[in-house]
Amino acid sequence: MAMVKEKEQNTKDKKLLVGVIWNFSAELKLTFMALLVLCTLATLLPFIPSSFSLSTSDFRFCISRFSSAVPLNTTTTVEESSSSPSPEKNLDRVLDNGVIKRTFTGYGSAAYNFVSMSAYRGGVNSFAVIGLSSKPLHVYGHPSYRCEWVSLDPTQDPISTTGFKILTDWGYGRIYTTVVVNCTFSSISAVNPQNSGGTLILHATTGDPTLNLTDSISVLTEPPKSVDFDLYNSTKKTKKYDYLYCGSSLYGNLSPQRVREWIAYHVRFFGERSHFVLHDAGGIHEEVFEVLKPWIELGRVTLHDIRDQERFDGYYHNQFMIVNDCLHRYRFMTKWMFFFDVDEFLHVPVKETISSVMESLEEYSQFTIEQMPMSSRICYSGDGPARTYRKWGIEKLAYRDVKKVPRRDRKYAVQPENVFATGVHMSQNLQGKTYHKAESKIRYFHYHGSISQRREPCRQLFNDSRVVFENTPYVLDTTICDVGLAVRTFELRTIGDRLLRTRQ
């Protein structure tokens, strides 16, 4: 009896198993097929050549072929012709008189027609546009500019005027030269008088007699109610600063300690109502930025990152463009604007102050500053070598070069509202008088090359009032050294001891 029951139970289990397999037959087939494929691949894999591969680049290639078939939406401003025409290939031909007529077809662009950096209002009816353009184009060609104002108010018609170009680089340009375009709408009393907003468009024409290409560039947009017209009325608006420093392009491996000395010295020299604008062309590395950071936090320094201008090969890291941008950006914010380098230190006589000197020069739109060339390699060791090496650079670099030369470079200061464009050593585009004999009032001491030395500056110590070093005569001049301790004390009181461990 037990045997019969056991057989019946086995029969039921077999039927149950068959039922389950039958219900899931499709899924089991797929599973077995997948296992078969995997086993086949595992068997064949050792026989596949190693050069065979399927990388992400193969997928990108497929995707790119698909995406290239999708057209992109582009907008081109055209005047007389497209700004990017496809040149037609003209074949050489033989004229009736037997002369072979040769043809020339241009492709691509060796340099941009115009590289826009900035544009600013220069008054109620004028603007300044700052940028770069092809140097050969301006030397040998005849490019021109037209300025157009398009109001956001649809009831106002666009107005235009001829742009007056100013080339500021005095022949120093390379592939690119600096161009300042003055847009003065003299036919009207004010542009955007209702403060309804609008856009300034610069039309830059190459002047090609055959194919006169024009690029239309939107260089400035004024939102509604954004213009303070009182800013351009000197009798109504008080300047934010008395003195503003416009720095040139800073590049290379600059010394943090030399920058530290320079900024502390001049913040003290110019006083509370002053500001410093510096431009980083690659020279403000991390250690230099740490030196500037306390002064930035106090609102005494503004730093501009201009490293992208390196794409365009202009003179000295596009120095002329940078100083002109600074001129027009801060033109109505300061009474006086100074242009000199970070290895140069201004000085006024002991009984004078910078305020008294500037008051005596108010009748001039510009004055130049005489150079006192200092050695950046030999030091005065009046207190002994041990103490000398612990001093700041300006406290021990005390020997002035007295070799007679025809002329030395000067630096300068301007009242910016009277200046339309500027240079490195002076401005030639201004209204008003220039004064060149201010040496009894103000001078600058130039420590050439010291800013780029990442080491102790003293190569040799002297204790004499007159020395000859490498065939150059020097005399002892402690003018800047004498204020070194006061500058160090000023820095400590102003920003604390956070820079005490600054490296050379």
UniProtKB/Swiss-Prot annotation:
It is a single-pass membrane protein. The keyword Glycosyltransferase applies. It comes from the Eukaryota. It is found in: Golgi apparatus membrane. It is an enzyme of class 2 (transferase). GO terms for molecular function: glycosyltransferase activity. Keywords: Cell wall biogenesis/degradation, Glycosyltransferase, Golgi apparatus, Membrane, Transferase, Transmembrane, Transmembrane helix. Its main location: Golgi. InterPro entries: Glyco_transf_92 (IPR008166). Involved in the biosynthesis of beta-1,4-galactan. Beta-1,4-galactans are abundant polysaccharides in plant cell walls and are found as side-chain of rhamnogalacturonan I, which is a major component of pectin. Belongs to the glycosyltransferase 92 family. This is Galactan beta-1,4-galactosyltransferase GALS3. The lineage of its organism: Eukaryota, Viridiplantae, Streptophyta, Embryophyta, Tracheophyta.
